[in-house]
């Protein structure tokens, strides 16, 4: 179910970028429903989005079996895993981290219980255990940065100091860090230091959006935030 934009929930300003992927992706979390979108301001996630790739039937992976209810699944099973990701902005790469493993995926509530109980342990492990493999880009025109996290191990294609254009491939979607299934977490912030940065709004220049129901019509959106629960794609 799609959320409705709540007037005044997301302030003006921030960053305007391009969707960083091809194909159809479900907006799992968005600041259109609540701020902070992830329930916390920690690590500059105030206005962050979570996107997960879906097929024409709206599934993130092939239809689940009984095994998926009781056991984790390989991340390679999911449509998002390994999908190319592109820089949403022109700018300079200021920070990268690679080498964190891609975890098994957990679709059911039952399989997520032990993962949730281990959350404090991951936080104590330090910053890499939360975003996993990630890239942070300083926006060329402005003081802000954009971070893409939970990338696939070994997929990061840029290094600090590299200049990128919007649309350049920079990595692939993975399941590293604090992630239960392959997805892209993307956010804008006022500095590249995830420990001290504050989140700022992120909007996308132009994209198509529809409700998740099969056959739902597409609507063109400009300089706005994808709604939580909506499927989005390039224009």
Region roles according to the model:
Residues 1-99, 211-235:
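Polar/charged, compositionally biased leader and regulatory segments
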Residues 36-38, 125-127, 156, 162-165, ...:
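Acidic, glycine-rich catalytic/binding loops that coordinate metals and/or anionic ligands
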Residues 91, 161-173:
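A structural signal for short beta-strand/turn segments enriched in small hydrophobics and glycine
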Residues 79-81, 130-131, 156-157:
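Short, small/polar residue-rich loop motifs at catalytic or cofactor-binding pockets
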Residues 57, 98-101, 170-180:
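Short, charged beta-turn/beta-strand-edge "cap" motif at the junction between a beta-strand
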Residues 71, 95-152:
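Zn2+-dependent peptidoglycan hydrolase active-site motif and core
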Residues 107-116, 183-194:
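Short, compositionally biased
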